[in-house]
A protein has these predicted regions:
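Single conserved hydrophobic/aromatic residue that forms the stacking wall/gate
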Residues: 1-12
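Short aromatic/hydrophobic "clamp" motif used to bind/position activated sugar donors
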Residues: 25
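Conserved donor NDP-sugar-binding/catalytic core segment of glycosyltransferases
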Residues: 37-68
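Catalytic beta-strand/loop signature of glycosyltransferases that borders the donor
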Residues: 58, 126-132
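Conserved ATP-binding subdomain of kinase catalytic cores across diverse folds
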Residues: 210-308, 338
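C-lobe/activation-segment region of protein kinase-like
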Residues: 363-425
Length: 431
């Protein structure tokens, strides 16, 4: 379909394209003209090669300006800094649907944003050899007026395509666009990033790398407090990102030079637990950023757990297989301790579980605070102190924990109950 527009054209253009049932789309601004042969020439190129996503003509100015509109050849590196494809270009309707059409948030240069959406993950652009577009220029035309909206355009593009700009420019698109790569190199010296991505999730490297830029604007908030959890859909997979708050000044120095960040420890410890066949959501990666040699924000990324419940649910609702669930949690705790791992934030919200046909699945989260070394009987039983429950629940936990570690179950129960009472008493005094 050929779509013409003027004035409120962006709105009408979106509506017209959404209603079209044709295979190909060609937007043409009402002031401009195309040659009678352009569409047939362009369709030939699209049908000849399925990798071709966009076919555009050579163009000539008419109106207040004359001569050929000499646009540079297409490349992703150049597309990251400037648009070299006019709105008048033929593309498949399926591409428009795939990227969600023209962005409604951006109020200028929507064609540039659209071409980035279509082409950033690959695809060819063909420019026909002959002049087949006649582009009208008037004093005060939209292209000239759009220049005043440059800060807005830059902000929206960075928000929507941070991964693309990171890959092509090494960071954000800057207001002086041609200097973007150099500015980003200089900034990276003073604001270095540290990151790692698990080999199985290398396709998410760009996402992990730009978390300091995109975290506040994307995703769904799961929890917000001292730290923040957000869920993202990346490449069809649900992932959870934990953003750790910026530490106080002394710790900013310590984390920058001497100590692993919480995000990095979470990533490393999750991989360690999974090596020991202890359940934990698959770690994807981490990213941290510093500023002027002071540690800043850090982010840990993992797959979203498929476990629908936490230990906190056990005292609050009936579970038909409650004893099996408690025994599975006790066994998981015992395996942790037998491997010399003591979780120092072993609370009800950090133990997840799911009831499956093959048995109860347990996963441990919030892993940045671990202690490594031999875990004694007393230390192991004290580790249950923050888990609420009834006497019957503690009896099951103690019995299974004792069996798994070869301890006396009566002694374990005694120590677990003592630790729980001490913790409850301390909490009451603090509150």
């Amino acid at each position: 379909d050929l779509v013409r527009s003027r004035g409120l054209g962006d709105v009408y253009k979106r509506q017209a394209i959404s209603l079209s049932h044709r295979e190909y789309i060609l937007p043409v601004d009402a002031d401009n003209r195309i040659s009678p042969t352009f569409i047939s020439h362009a369709v030939v190129e699209l049908e000849r090669d399925p990798d071709v996503k966009v076919v555009c003509p050579r163009a000539e100015f008419i109106g207040d300006r004359s001569g050929e509109w000499k646009l540079p050849p297409f490349s992703l590196k150049l597309l990251a800094r400037k648009n070299m494809i006019d709105t008048c270009a033929l593309y498949r309707k399926t591409e428009w649907e795939r990227v969600g059409g023209y962005c409604e948030e951006i109020i200028a240069r929507e064609d540039w944003e659209f071409w980035i959406s279509v082409l950033k993950d690959g695809g060819k652009v063909v420019r026909l050899p002959q002049i087949e577009l006649y582009y009208r220029v008037r004093a005060g035309s939209k292209r000239i007026v759009d220049r005043s909206l440059k800060p807005h355009v830059t902000k929206v593009l960075n928000k929507r395509h941070a991964e693309f700009f990171e890959r092509e420019l090494g960071g954000k698109l800057r207001s002086v666009r041609s200097w973007s790569r150099w500015i980003n190199r200089i900034e990276r010296f003073f604001r270095p990033r540290c990151m790692a991505v698990a080999p199985d999730y290398s396709n998410m490297s760009d996402f992990v790398k730009v978390l300091p830029v995109i975290f506040e604007d994307r995703g769904t908030v799961i929890y917000k407090g001292r730290n923040e959890l957000r869920e993202f859909d990346i490449a069809g997979q649900k992932v959870v990102v934990k953003s750790f708050q910026i530490p106080h000044l002394l710790n900013r120095i310590i984390y920058n030079f001497f100590r692993e960040s919480k995000a990095r420890r979470s990533f490393r410890y999750a991989a360690m637990l999974r090596q020991f066949n202890i359940g934990s959501p698959a770690p994807i990666g981490f990213c941290s950023v510093s500023s002027w040699f002071l540690f800043g924000k850090s982010y840990f990324v993992s797959l979203r757990s498929e476990c629908p419940y936490t230990y906190r649910d056990l005292p609050q609702r009936p579970f038909e297989e409650q004893e099996k669930i408690l025994r599975a949690i006790a066994r998981t705790t015992a395996v942790l301790h037998e491997h010399g791992i003591l979780h120092k934030d072993y609370s009800a919200g950090n133990i997840l579980f799911a009831e499956k046909p093959e048995g109860v699945s347990v996963e441990i989260i919030d892993l940045n605070r671990m202690r490594f070394g031999k875990v004694s009987l007393e230390e192991g039983c004290k580790n249950f102190e923050r888990l609420p429950g009834t006497d019957e629940m503690f009896a099951v936990l103690a019995d299974e924990y004792a069996k798994s570690r070869g301890f006396d179950k009566k002694k374990c129960l005694q120590l677990i109950e003592k630790a729980h009472k001490s913790s409850s008493s301390f909490s009451s005094k603090v509150s």
